[in-house]
Amino acid sequence: MINPKTTATPAGERELLIEREFAAPRELVFKAWTERDRLMQWWGPPTWPIDYCTVDLGVGGAWHYRMRGPAGEEGWGKGVYREIMPSSRLVYSDYFSDEDGTEIPPEAIAEIDFVDRGGTTLVRNKTIFASGEHREQVLGMGVVEGMSETMDRLDEHLAAVAAG
């Protein structure tokens, strides 16, 4: 189900913009996207959470993860960092992968901006796909619903951290 707090807008032929505002400081939201232990608590929809994750945060480094479905099926993903501006911006090449981290084309580029709104943080996640067909394929796989549910889990994680 898509939470109305999360907006998803196809742009141009190859882009998808997903936005969500969180009641947490920008530094904490950025850490949630870049620290392994935090990612393990929220990445993926509730029915496809990650159960394995490594993070090598640095340009040229990668995060590699496994999502596990309700019947035990698995899906692997990998992001190779291209740009890191602490607490402000992440850019990475986004791929499906295998368990060894071998990238499976086509590549998409994820540009994630963390916008300070004076006590809240807007996450602006723009994905640029290799082609319009690639975007349509990923949309057909339910990426909008999955990211909305994932953002709900991030919201819950941030609230739990704030509550101590």
Q: Would you name each region that the model predicts?
A:
Residues V29, L39, W63-Y65, Y81, ...:
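Hydrophobic pocket/interface hotspot
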Residues Y52, L158-G164:
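Short, highly charged C-terminal tails/helix-capping segments
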Residues S93, S97-S148:
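Beta-strand/loop substructures that line and gate deep hydrophobic ligand-binding cavities in soluble
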Residues R26-E27, D56-G58, R82-R89, D113-L122:
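A short, structured loop/turn motif at beta-sheet edges
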Residues M1-P49:
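Hydrophobic ligand-binding cavity/cleft-lining segments
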Residues D51-Y95:
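Glycine-rich portal/gate segments that line the openings of hydrophobic small-molecule binding cavities
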Residues E13-E19, R26, I50, A62, ...:
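Intrinsic-disorder/low-complexity, polar/charged segments enriched in Ser/Thr/Lys/Arg/Asp/Glu/Gln
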Residues P10-G12, L57, A71-G75, T102-P106, ...:
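A generic structural micro-feature
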